[in-house]
Amino acid sequence: MARYLGPTCKLSRREGTDLFLKSGVRPLESKCKAETAPGQHGQRRGRLSDYGVQLREKQKVRRTYGLLEKQFRSYYKEAARLKGATGENLLKLLESRLDNVVYRMGFGATRAESRQLVSHKAILVNGKALNIPSYQVSEGDVIAVREKSKNQLRIQNALGIAAQRPDVEWVDVNADKKEGTFKRVPDRVDLPADINENLIVELYSK
């Protein structure tokens, strides 16, 4: 499936915030200039229209989870069919993706690296190898690194990076065994406050 393979810092600069597309816990400002748009002579951002604000929020979330527009819109349509607030449903669907859960558990330093681990069958779900990054993880599912992949240096490094991030309340991880349990779908209060999912709903509702 097609993926963006260009500079990840460029995407974060475009959205004006760290999308955590690079490994490590350094703030974006130490890696690239968040206040300027991409390009050698990036210009300061002007005032956006309502549509522009909505579009930038959608792009920010879509790029954070590493999805193409068609995929992201499909998640929105599914979220709209579910009971409850569409915006919250959207975030819960995104957070329940297998590649994202692998990232949240700290087995991958980034979502892109976590997706690669899944694609290469380095991840087990309830004891079975699964190579579908979009697989929706359910409560109680056990996610583990495959035995022959446990000594990969990138996984060791990722766990070290994850230890410096705030705890993820909806997963339970045993770093020594390199396995974890998806305890529950996260509530809205568990997720970043700087995401305004209502802007995405407004954009797609037009």
Swiss-Prot record:
Q: Which GO molecular function entries does the Swiss-Prot or TrEMBL record give?
A: rRNA binding; structural constituent of ribosome
Pfam families recorded for this chain?
A: Ribosomal_S4, S4
> InterPro entries from the entry?
Ribosomal_uS4, Ribosomal_uS4_bac-type, Ribosomal_uS4_CS, Ribosomal_uS4_N, S4_RNA-bd, S4_RNA-bd_sf
The protein's job, in short, is: One of the primary rRNA binding proteins, it binds directly to 16S rRNA where it nucleates assembly of the body of the 30S subunit. With S5 and S12 plays an important role in translational accuracy.
Query: Which GO biological process categories is it annotated with?
Result: ribosomal small subunit biogenesis; translation
- One cellular component GO annotation, for this chain's record? small ribosomal subunit
Write out the entry's keywords from A to Z: Ribonucleoprotein, Ribosomal protein, RNA-binding, rRNA-binding
> Under which name does UniProt file this protein?
Small ribosomal subunit protein uS4
Q: Which organism is it from?
A: Teredinibacter turnerae (strain ATCC 39867 / T7901)
* Subunit field text: Part of the 30S ribosomal subunit. Contacts protein S5. The interaction surface between S4 and S5 is involved in control of translational fidelity.
The gene that this protein is the product of is rpsD
According to the entry, every stretch annotated as the S4 RNA-binding domain falls at 96-156
Q: TM spans, by residue?
A: none
Q: Which family does it belong to?
A: Belongs to the universal ribosomal protein uS4 family.
